[in-house]
Amino acid sequence: MKFPEFKDYYQQLISTSSISSTDSSWDEGNAEVINKLAQWCEDLGCEVEIEEIEKGKLNLLAKLGSGEGGLLLAGHTDTVPYDEGRWNYEPHALTEANDRFYGLGTADMKGFFAFILEAIKNINWKDQSKPLYILATCDEETTMLGARHFASNTKIQPDYCIIGEPTSLKPIRGHKGHVANAIRVTGKSGHSSDPAHGVNALEIMNEIMFALMTLKNKLVKEYHNPGFSIPYPTLNLGHIHGGDSPNRICGCCELHYDVRPLPGISLDGLDNMLRDALKEVEAKWPGRIDITPLHEPIPGYECSADSPIVTSTADICGQDVETVNYCTEAPFLQDLCPTLVLGPGSIEQAHQPDEYLAFSFIDPTISVLSKLMYKHCF
């Protein structure tokens, strides 16, 4: 059988739109990309399972070989929306220029699947002793629906997992989590000339912000991980809106904030810290403060520095293992097995106009993936 060339895989992946968004006007689903991957994997001899988690939201699990353990190569098939006016290249076409592939998803991260398929083609699988798994998920860019569902329901037990997010081929063994909430204060509006006839939501929010800043300082003092460039949890007040006129008592105010916890801080523990920080204000103003999540919280993630996958992958890549501050699906897949994040392209290209993958990553990535397959499947 004549298989597609590497560039053909890449072209078809990029030209097949698979945007996920909390804005329904952008949200597309990933069925078409999953169906392409399924056909290619089957052509290479894989057993393929497709699961529809929600309408148009699919996960794919392909398996090559049999036995216990093995290696799981994982990634997401969705992309973020784009602003066409800021792109100099067609987002849904693979454009070659400046020794780069341009297009939406070239780095983050549909292109990773082309590398997996190319590496599989280049290996003689005759003496394989452990399975190779390929996981393609949905909705990483919004809710991480695919990875959450897979980790909670799968029956496979691979030895190790590699997630192919763009890390410039540097192995990543840890990252912070992300929690984002909205705090809405409902006051009582009225004319500013008579404050006693109203309840100023902005003034209540001022008390809330003071409590959050106290918590921010506590997090810096009490938690420290020297493996991170910013070695403490961060808390950021990112957006606030309230009131409509200087001569009117503010009747409503809303604040959006985020926290990036270090690995080891549980989501429940962080939520308890947040609630404890605000309990005095909530007791003072009963029924006027509502807290709602802006997205499903993502825990921090850390793979032990002593894990064999850490040392062997560092040797294969010739790179020191690092930690980062952005989030991936790793916290969920780490529940299955020791997990690293490692892939071609730079994270600086993710979510940017004229996203690209430099040609200089192509041969090294195929080589690294081939060595990982040999290491963990033979």
UniProtKB/Swiss-Prot annotation:
Q: What pathway is this protein a component of?
A: Amino-acid biosynthesis; L-arginine biosynthesis; L-ornithine from N(2)-acetyl-L-ornithine (linear): step 1/1
* The keyword Chloroplast appears for this protein: no
Enzyme Commission code(s) on record: 3.5.1.16
Which InterPro entries is this protein grouped with? AcOrn-deacetyl (IPR010169), ArgE/DapE_CS (IPR001261), Bact_exopeptidase_dim_dom (IPR036264), Peptidase_M20 (IPR002933), Peptidase_M20_dimer (IPR011650), Peptidase_M20A (IPR050072)
Q: Provide the binding site for Zn(2+) 1.
A: H76, D108, E165
- CC per GO annotation: cytoplasm
Matching CDD domains, A to Z? M20_ArgE (cd03894)
Residues given in the record as Zn(2+) 2 binding sites: D108, E141, H351
Provide the catalytic activity annotation: N(2)-acetyl-L-ornithine + H2O = L-ornithine + acetate
Q: Which residues form the active site?
A: D78, E140
Q: Supply the alphabetized keyword list.
A: Amino-acid biosynthesis, Arginine biosynthesis, Cobalt, Cytoplasm, Hydrolase, Metal-binding, Zinc
Cofactor info, note text: Binds 2 Zn(2+) or Co(2+) ions per subunit.
Provide the cofactor list for this protein. Zn(2+); Co(2+); glutathione
Name any one Pfam family assigned in the record.
Answer: Peptidase_M20
The EC class name is hydrolase
One GO BP: L-arginine biosynthetic process
NCBIfam families in the cross-refs: AcOrn-deacetyl, PRK05111.1
The entry's family comment says: Belongs to the peptidase M20A family. ArgE subfamily.
What is the stated purpose of this protein?
Catalyzes the hydrolysis of the amide bond of N(2)-acetylated L-amino acids. Cleaves the acetyl group from N-acetyl-L-ornithine to form L-ornithine, an intermediate in L-arginine biosynthesis pathway, and a branchpoint in the synthesis of polyamines.
This protein's name = Acetylornithine deacetylase
UniProt gene name: argE
